[in-house]
Amino acid sequence: MKTILDFHDKKSKKQKISMITCYDYSFARIVADSDIDCILVGDSLAMVMLGHSTTLDVSASVMAHHTAAVVRGAGDKFVIADLPFMSYRKGLTANMTAVEKVMKAGAHAVKLEGAAGNLKLVRHLVDSGVPVMGHLGLTPQSVNQLGGFKVQGRDEKAQKKILEAALQLQDAGAFSVVLECVPSKLAKEITAALEIPTIGIGAGVDCDGQVLVLQDMLGMNQGFKPKFVKTYLDGFNTIKGALNQYHQEVSTEIFPSEKESYS
């Protein structure tokens, strides 16, 4: 996928969209050589790469730094960058400063969380030529307001609010919307109501696509496995095993051998 038109094309053809998070050049090169459709440089890097407990502790400069690294390795993959917490709550001038940083880093689009208070910005960005992906349901930047990482849209009132927000984002010009941790039935209803594609994470099978955190699906975060995550590799133990083997071979003088030495 190379443009936002490919997102709409996939939805119209009922072809699922695969999106994965990525935060660095080395992994981006692997993703570039895979069948994955698009990359999200998520503000989840605050937790995954920097060890913070939430996504709140990341700046636009940090997002731009990681976005640039990913873009250098991503080949022709479509790259979306998150706008970090509070970067789009300071008026249009400050908003555009954050957007400019990640777009100049090479992102093809930006993602922002929520709809209330953001619709004017979405319209402004779209009118300025910046593609925007929305994000509804569990919005990690609002974790304190939401009372933690919880499923959203359980009751009828909340479901109606999320559906209305999705329609508002579409009307404002968003090319896609992420639905995170919402009941499958609600995600199905929203997907059917929208002309733009939905990307689910913990939102059931009926979304137009799916996204996972790369390190989660590779099984690298031992002891952390939300219900919506499927692991495709025991990455933690595989990598640990390689490190232990390296240590053992160094300790016993198996490595380096003559093969890895110069004459």
From Swiss-Prot:
Pfam families linked to this entry: Pantoate_transf (PF02548)
Principal location listed in the UniProt entry: cytoplasm
E.C. number: 2.1.2.11
Binding site for 3-methyl-2-oxobutanoate: 43-44, 82, 111
Hydrolase found in the keyword field: no
PANTHER family: 3-METHYL-2-OXOBUTANOATE HYDROXYMETHYLTRANSFERASE (PTHR20881:SF0)
Protein family membership: Belongs to the PanB family.
Molecular functions per Gene Ontology: 3-methyl-2-oxobutanoate hydroxymethyltransferase activity; magnesium ion binding
Gene3D superfamilies listed in its UniProt record: Phosphoenolpyruvate-binding domains
Active-site residues, Swiss-Prot/TrEMBL: 180
HAMAP family to which the protein is assigned, alphabetical: PanB (MF_00156)
Cofactor(s) essential for the protein: Mg(2+)
This protein's record includes keyword Metal-binding: yes
Top-level enzyme category: transferase
Source superkingdom: Bacteria
Full protein name: 3-methyl-2-oxobutanoate hydroxymethyltransferase
Entry's localization field: Cytoplasm
Biological-process GO terms, alphabetical: pantothenate biosynthetic process
Complexes and interactors: Homodecamer; pentamer of dimers.
One of the record's GO cellular component terms: cytoplasm
Pathway: Cofactor biosynthesis; (R)-pantothenate biosynthesis; (R)-pantoate from 3-methyl-2-oxobutanoate: step 1/2
Key words of the record: Cytoplasm, Magnesium, Metal-binding, Pantothenate biosynthesis, Transferase
Residues that coordinate or bind Mg(2+): 43, 82, 113
Function, as annotated: Catalyzes the reversible reaction in which hydroxymethyl group from 5,10-methylenetetrahydrofolate is transferred onto alpha-ketoisovalerate to form ketopantoate.
